């Protein structure tokens, strides 16, 4: 019987979550969904000085907005301390763990000496017990750390689903601290216990964790367990070619929501930051899940490009249904104190092809519900004294005609004939006065969606 796929996203709640972080949630989520497996959310909150509940809330909010639903969790490492200590005691009883009383000053001196000798800094095993070895006397009043007995000799080998075969000599790995002097277990140990208890089959994470993997595999084997399959994702770079990080100006995921990006567009764009399906650039969430597999994950670093993200978002705006789009535009309008009405889906249909975010679409929609600010340069260019008689005549005809697209188009045509002018000469000033811009969709369609009194008031404003 094939084992059910179980993946996880295990962020540390030490600040906001950016696109590089959330991509590490997207791929394990997609792999679980595409294989009928489970996706688990685990909060690695053992850094008590930096972890906050507010950061946890933002992680969950960001995942919810993007539709990255999880089947189990969130599990919190700080709530699992008793379990870690139980497993730690088992390792200690089996002889895989030993106390180390080396002070920070001694460790610093060792590191300095190794660096002076141009050696790789590493713990030298002073307190590691061995047959026939005499350990130093235990210092009084010193609480030891607990170190894991890394195997001597041999190598750690795994078939990484992104990077291929990786082999690390055990001689490169020193004896890892797995419990602090106060008994609190450390990151690499907690991760192994969590992945075992949660039956994780595939660990899909950033390649900044590659160096942790051989240490974790050795702990798995000391516990008599097989490690999961690993896939280490290449780094996401910012537009300057640096690793995306908070320090390098990365924005919170939720800021993209506020700036008018669509969840499906974000998933589409993020999916392409390290994975591909032929030349397909625009695809639905369902298509992504149908196509996704670990074999198509790229090995090279992926560079974020906000202009490309806006283009992807524009494509998704075009194909999104107007009824689904309207509430998102309404949310943007509400931030401006504007309440839309039943016309909003039709407004979305009329303007969405010229927009790349819901904020830009809301800019257009706002003109139908709130006062507009005229552009003096456009007014000066298009609303000339010569065209004002035609504008006055149009106002008269629009005041008495039926308020539908055909009747409005007929009124405009009557003015063009009566004044012997071409359409652009009339349409441009009408657009400027009614919508605040000389460039809009079809004039009769725009006027039909605008209230008659609003149109007449704006036409008579100059």
From Swiss-Prot:
Cystine connections: none
Q: Could you tell me which CDD domains the record lists for this protein?
A: GluRS_core
- GO process terms (BP): glutamyl-tRNA aminoacylation
Enumerate the residues binding ATP: 246
Its chief place of residence is: cytoplasm
What Enzyme Commission number does this protein have? 6.1.1.17
Keyword Lipid biosynthesis part of the UniProt annotation: no
Q: Where in the cell is it found?
A: Cytoplasm
Q: Motif 'HIGH' region residues?
A: 11-21
Q: Name one GO molecular function term.
A: glutamate-tRNA ligase activity
Q: In UniProt terms, what function does this protein have?
A: Catalyzes the attachment of glutamate to tRNA(Glu) in a two-step reaction: glutamate is first activated by ATP to form Glu-AMP and then transferred to the acceptor end of tRNA(Glu).
Quaternary structure note: Monomer.
Fetch the PANTHER family from UniProt: GLUTAMATE--TRNA LIGASE, GLUTAMATE--TRNA LIGASE, MITOCHONDRIAL-RELATED
Q: What's the protein name? A: Glutamate--tRNA ligase
UniProt source species: Albidiferax ferrireducens (strain ATCC BAA-621 / DSM 15236 / T118)
Protein's gene? gltX
